[in-house]
Structure formats: structure tokens, C-alpha cells
């Protein structure tokens, strides 16, 4: 036995669409105040792209690029998620796949001199720890402590310059640990 359904009248389908449209419109209107809060929450996130180098040691100089995603917990404290690609360039200047390392890690920063009305610059003290992922002849755990200048941190694009001390604890036999001064320049978005 086959049961046949009656076709729905057109006014019922139209009523259903109107109800659905009204609910969608109401949800958008009620979410409008939340968008302003989300925008202020997004203002706490920043991304930095940078280049850095260190002083030569044992005929080797580190040079690399980094990506730093940071979140401001308060006006002074920030959390950082870091990714660094570093080449350990020997004295002859040759770069090979085996003398590079990609490190992931995190860190903390404290704004020691926040921006003021007269001066838009800020100075941050940062500490970070990263460790090599994947296979590399230069596997290491890197520890950094530095002072960073951030030009106008309230702007969407700000220059960032850092100087500090870096220590790389190599896990490969035959490699001496690296320690020395480093300089970093970049841009904050």
C-alpha cells in the first residue's frame, strides 16, 4: 500500500521562510553588541615577523627568521607562541639543509616602560624557550632573554627591535653549545 502525502499549501512554505528569516534577523541584531567585545578581544592578539642574528662563536653564526603570535593578558604581561627557523652558518658562509633547525616554543613578556601620552614607544623584557621539531643535525633547545623596543604598540603596524642573550643547548654529539648576544628586527601587526 502506498501512502500519498498532500502537497503543502504555498502559504505554509512562505510562512516557514518568513519565520526563518525573522529568526536569522533577530539573531544578527542581538549579536551586534557582542561584535564590539570581540573586536576589543582581537586587539589583544598581535603577530610579529622578524629576522635575527647572533654573535659568532666556534666559527658559527646563527641567522634566522621568526613568527611570534602574542596575546596580552594585561596591559603589561603577554604570552608568546614562537616559531623560529635558524641557519647556523659556518665561517665559510655555506648554508645546507643539515645546518638548519626549526624550533617551536613559547615565552612571556613584561612591559617595563609602557607608552605614555608624550611618548608612544614601549620597552618589553622578554624570555622564551624553544625546541627543535623534526630531524636536524643541529637539534637544540634555545633560551633567550632580551629587551625589545616596540614603536607605537597601539598602531596596527609597529616596528620591533630587540637585543639580548641567547643560549642554544645542542643535543647532537660533537657540537658545542652556543651562547652569545643577538639582535632582532621585525614588524608587529
Residue ranges and their predicted role:
Residues 68-157:
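Gram-negative (and chloroplast) outer-membrane scaffold detector with strong preference
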Amino acid at each position: 500500500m502506498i501512502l500519498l502525502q498532500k502537497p503543502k499549501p504555498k502559504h505554509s512554505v512562505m510562512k516557514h521562510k518568513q519565520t526563518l528569516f525573522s529568526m536569522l534577523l533577530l539573531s544578527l541584531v542581538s549579536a551586534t553588541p557582542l561584535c564590539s567585545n570581540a573586536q576589543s578581544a582581537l586587539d589583544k592578539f598581535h603577530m610579529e615577523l622578524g629576522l635575527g642574528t647572533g654573535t659568532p662563536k666556534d666559527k658559527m653564526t646563527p641567522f634566522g627568521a621568526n613568527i611570534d603570535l602574542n596575546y596580552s593578558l594585561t596591559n603589561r604581561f603577554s604570552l608568546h607562541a614562537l616559531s623560529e627557523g635558524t641557519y647556523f652558518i659556518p665561517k665559510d658562509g655555506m648554508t645546507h639543509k643539515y645546518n638548519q633547525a626549526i624550533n617551536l616554543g613559547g615565552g612571556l613578556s613584561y612591559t617595563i616602560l609602557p607608552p605614555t601620552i608624550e611618548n608612544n614607544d614601549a620597552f618589553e623584557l622578554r624570555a622564551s624557550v624553544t625546541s627543535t621539531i623534526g630531524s636536524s643535525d643541529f637539534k637544540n633547545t634555545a633560551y633567550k632573554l632580551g629587551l625589545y623596543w616596540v614603536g607605537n604598540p597601539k598602531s596596527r603596524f609597529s616596528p620591533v627591535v630587540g637585543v639580548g642573550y641567547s643560549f642554544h643547548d645542542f643535543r647532537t654529539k660533537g657540537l658545542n653549545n652556543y651562547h652569545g648576544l643577538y639582535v632582532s628586527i621585525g614588524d608587529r601587526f
